[in-house]
């Protein structure tokens, strides 16, 4: 969590008007709609109250918009990761949204509304990653 604290300080100090896309595997599912079972997962690494609070502070420090959540508002459940342990990830449906695309206030106007996509069909490939690619269109 030290990394996130340092990143939060860095994001708080930067000029929010400058375009920035903060993207990647954050390994934290911030919302009850980003996990398959909120009650169970709140006791498991990746969705504990401390982790969620840390990620929320990072998002607030940079004034970031969550472009994936903007495209798919709550209460829609979202996931970008499924364990290899499940033979059929769709049938077990125990996914987490650990991968994120956040736009700074300087970039948000360039995000094409509704263009964010979680490419979950990649999980159907032979020997795929346990994470799905996420894309968004930018009008630059």
Residue spans for each PLM region:
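Short, structured loop/turn "capping" segments at alpha-beta junctions
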Residues: 17-22, 65-66
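A long, amphipathic alpha-helix that forms part
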Residues: 1-17
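Amphipathic alpha-helical interface surfaces
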Residues: 3, 7, 22, 51-54
């Amino acid at each position: 969590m030290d990394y996130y604290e340092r990143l939060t300080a860095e994001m708080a100090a930067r000029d929010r008007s400058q375009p920035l896309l903060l993207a990647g595997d954050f390994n934290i599912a911030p919302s009850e709609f980003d996990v398959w079972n909120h009650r169970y997962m709140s006791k498991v690494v990746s969705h504990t109250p401390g982790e969620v609070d840390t990620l929320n502070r990072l998002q607030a420090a940079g004034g970031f918009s969550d472009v994936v959540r903007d495209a798919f508002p709550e209460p829609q459940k979202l996931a970008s990761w499924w364990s290899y342990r499940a033979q059929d990830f769709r049938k077990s449906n125990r996914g987490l949204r650990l991968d994120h695309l956040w736009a700074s206030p300087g970039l948000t106007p360039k995000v094409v509304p509704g263009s964010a996509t979680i490419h979950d069909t990649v999980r159907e490939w032979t020997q795929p990653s346990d994470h799905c690619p996420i894309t968004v269109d930018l009008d630059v």
